[in-house]
Amino acid sequence: KFYKTNICDREAIYKIFEDEKPNIVVNFAAESHVDRSIENPEVFLKTNILGTQVLMDACRKYGIDRYHQVSTDEVYGDLPLERPDLLFTEGTPIHTSSPYSASKASADLLVLAYHRTYGLPVTISRCSNNYGPYHFPEKLIPLMIANALNEKPLPVYGKGENVRDWLYVEDHCKAIDLIIHKGTVGEVYNV
């Protein structure tokens, strides 16, 4: 079933847990557009941090076998362009660069705190940019395609030197499924 509700609506989330009795919870809910987070950080903080807390509290109250937090490589910040040999690892320190990345890093830390404090069985995955069917038109790939088809200018961010990694959405889902079923509780996985 699909429930369209606000992740911050504790009553609605608890009702879903009561009705469905899930044993695995995967938190895909997020505000995720960096530029919008700069214009209006409040909605990012509410959804990404407080919404995560509501889910974690529901998991504690109703009991689950596994909670999985879908995060982002944005929590690591930027790699220097002059060092293409560097990569993010699960041990890379958090170094946020926008309200979006700060909200996701905060949610990750909250999830790990619930694991340590309450013993909640959690895993976290941090991925790069996803692409695939039904991609929001504000995101880079659909925006570039739409602009090219409509003979509009293609946006260039900064000096045009930024590098982005891309992950097909179905590959991301397969990785999440693998982490949920084979991953170690309390660990973070880069995808």
Q: What is the meaning of each model-derived region?
A:
Residues 79, 134, 166:
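Short Asp/Glu-rich motifs
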Residues 117, 163-166:
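A short, basic/aromatic alpha-helical/loop segment that forms part
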Residues 1-130, 170:
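N-terminal Rossmann-like NAD(P)+-binding domain of SDR-like oxidoreductases, especially those catalyzing
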Residues 59, 115, 148, 179-180:
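Hydrophobic pocket-lining residues that define ligand/cofactor binding sites across diverse proteins
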Residues 92, 161-162:
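Catalytic Tyr-x(3-8)-Lys segment
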Residues 105, 130-143, 150-152, 157, ...:
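Glycine/proline-rich active-site loop of Rossmann-fold NAD(P)-dependent oxidoreductases
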